[in-house]
A protein has these predicted regions:
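Short beta-strand His + acidic residue motifs that chelate non-heme Fe in jelly-roll/DSBH
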Residues: 49, 67-68, 84, 90-96
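A short, N-terminal "cap"/entry segment at the start of jelly-roll beta-barrel domains
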Residues: 1-33, 114-118
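Short acidic-glycine-tyrosine-enriched beta hairpin
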Residues: 72-86
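Short, conserved beta-strand element in jelly-roll/cupin
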Residues: 38-42, 51-67, 105
Length: 118
């Protein structure tokens, strides 16, 4: 068994305005097959349209988000779970007044966020 990794001990990255992201579990942290991370989206901000080569499970812990998956928009209110299949275009917009907090899971350690045109 490995030691617990506290989310607060992992440094934040800001790949886009209003977006905070961090990888909590990855190959670099000893995982052989799973990637786990945290995503925080400020009110009014959007994680741009993108795709992954593997499926992604999104656990919405707080906030209200509009999620677009392959052109279909859905309102997601925490607490909720959403699955985006491999190769599916998706983006997430915070439509509430408080931060959207998501924990994401990939069944792989080789994961890439590929931005696509909207």
């Amino acid at each position: 068994m490995s030691e617990p990794i506290r989310f607060t001990d992992v440094p934040d990255a800001s790949p886009f305005p209003g977006i905070i992201s961090k990888l909590v579990m990855s190959r670099e942290k000893g995982s052989a097959a799973i990637t786990v991370g945290e995503l925080r989206i400020a009110a009014g901000h959007t994680l741009p349209l993108h795709v992954h080569k593997v499926e992604e499970a999104l656990v919405f812990l707080s906030g209200d988000a509009k999620v677009e998956v392959d052109g279909k928009e859905t309102l997601v209110t925490a607490p909720s779970v959403l699955l985006t299949p491999a190769g599916t275009k998706h983006c997430i917009t915070n439509v509430g007044t408080s931060e959207v907090r998501i924990v994401f899971f990939f069944p792989a350690v080789e994961v890439e966020r590929i931005l696509v045109e909207h």
